[in-house]
Structures are given as C-alpha cells and as structure tokens.
Amino acid sequence: CWGMQVAVTAGRGAVKKAASSHIGIANQIKMSVEGFKHPIYKNKKDNFNSPAFNFDEVVTLPKNSICLASNKINKIQSIYFTVGDTKVWGLQYHPEITYEKMISLIEFRKKRLIDNRKVFKNEDEIKNHIAFIKDEIAVSNKSQRMLELKNWLDNIKHYN
C-alpha cells in the first residue's frame, strides 16, 4: 500500500489520512469495469477480501490513472497508470502477506492501536477483530487471495 501511495505522490497525485482504516483486513473490495479488464485481476472474483493495514489513502489520482477497485473505506483500492514507458500497478491492500502475519502485526501494535490511533477501545475489541480475521482465514482460498501477485509476476515476465 505504501508503494502505491509513493507512486501516486511521485506521479503528482495526492495521499491523505483516511477517515477510517483497515486493520488486518480490507473487506468487500469490488473491481471497477476497468478492473475486470486489467491483467492484475485476471481470474479474480469481483467481490473479495484481502489482508490490509493502512491509515492513509489515495485521494487524487495522477493524470491518466485508472481506478481498478474500491471498497467502502478506500475509494481507490487499486490503480493503473503510466509514466513515460513505465506501467504502474498499485494496490492499497496486501495479497503478498498472510492474514496470520496481519494478526501478529495487530498483536504487536495493540497498545498503539488502542492508545494512540484509537482504532479499538480495549483489548476485547482487538480479540473480536482477530476472531473476525480468523473466520476469513477459514473460508479464504490462498491461490485466489494471492492472484494479483501471480498475475503481476506473469505480466513482468513478458518484459524480459
């Protein structure tokens, strides 16, 4: 997600603190019409969840950008744009990271999430949120969850 935010900033777009955040999971990500056509989402189901951890979001896209997916928290979950000959694919979420790693990150940042970020009121809320993520682990399909990474790797093979 930070990579997309840096690319957007370098491309003269804008990133700001989000009104809400994803803590361990982004729910109900939906592809745009353009997203259905983009190679990053080849064979991907339209409505999906993914590991995510972010407090900031893209609010202004660089010129010639296309929003490929969104959800209720971030209107821009994935993008595509070009800078010269460079093709930029960006994701706000993390298909490359497991939910288990996200749970570890939540546990590691527990005090900050309660005291500083005020995302959770107490440890019980965190435990409930972790249980929610564990429910997702039980129903998610790893190959489907990581498909964007596979599609990106398959695509860059064509440039070598």
Identify the residue ranges that each predicted region occupies.
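Amide-donor transfer/coupling interface in amidating biosynthetic enzymes
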Residues: 31-160
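Cysteine-nucleophile active-site neighborhood
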Residues: 1-35
